[in-house]
Amino acid sequence: MDNHKSGSKKKNNGSCLLFVLLIIIFAAAIVLAWKFRDKSGTADVSATVQITQTTETESETKDPLEIILSGDVPSSHNINVEAVLQNPELPTGCEITSLTTVLNYWGYNVDKCDLADNYLHKESGGGEYTMYEAFLGTPYDSNALGCYAPVIKDAAEKYMARQSKKMQVADISGNSVEKVYACVAQGYPVVIWSTMNLHEPSWTTYWTNEDGTKFEFPSYEHCMVINGYNKNDNTVEVCDPMEGNTTYEMDRFEEIYKEMGSQAVLLYK
């Protein structure tokens, strides 16, 4: 009897130990599974936060000018801009008058003659300067030549330096006309270089510069502001400082824009 009971007791003890061991293993498995799930969830959340932060950072650091130039170009868009006329005061001042048009549109109450007198870099011609460096002559003189985009950018920056409400100024020369349309589509009129009535320019050598290069001036050189376009009608709307608010054929406008070096100046926020 005693031997039988002793054997049963040993079997019972063994079963109990096995049962306890199984419970421990099962519990450990549950704990490990829970920890893995917790870490996995944390990693997913962390990755999501990191992606979101990266996207927000990229958006915050993207150049505003790049955003404007890469904007969508719908089939048509028009900005209500009133043209400022250059005559009679500034017979050759189409460039500074075009800048005046854009500044007036943005709420700056400035006069074209004020800009010409106090902000436009002017030099006499003859070889020391080019139209990329200064206005050659004076816009009050009908025999003066004019200037190109960098000079108008410089005048705009000088003016902005004295204003409490400032805008950015960019020489966007070299960009395609489609980029110019992108600016207009987002509400930004653009100063561009063209010719009077879109005449075909002819290049005349005026003098030889000190470094031996020849200075060539394009006949009919002109500057205006594009404030609208319509691809369906093949037209562009411009503020022409000689003609006022005018409509030109788009194909011809684009052709002359390229021939004049795809020059443009943008004021933007």
Model-derived regions, located:
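Structural recognition of the beta-strand scaffold that forms the well-ordered cores
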Residues: G93, Q168-V169, P189-S194, V225, ...
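A short acidic/basic microdomain associated with nuclease active sites
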Residues: A83-V84, M167-A170
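Noncatalytic regulatory segments and standalone regulatory/sensor domains
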Residues: T204-D211, F215-P218, M224-K269
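...with weaker cross-activation on analogous glycine-rich loops/strands in unrelated enzymes
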Residues: K158, R162, I172-T195, H199
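Active-site-adjacent structural segments surrounding the nucleophilic cysteine of cysteine proteases
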Residues: D2-H4, N12-L22, F26-A155, R162, ...
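Short, basic, glycine/proline-bearing loop/turn elements
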Residues: M160-M167, D211
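A mature extracytoplasmic/lumenal domain signature
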Residues: S98, S173, S194-L198, G228-N230, ...
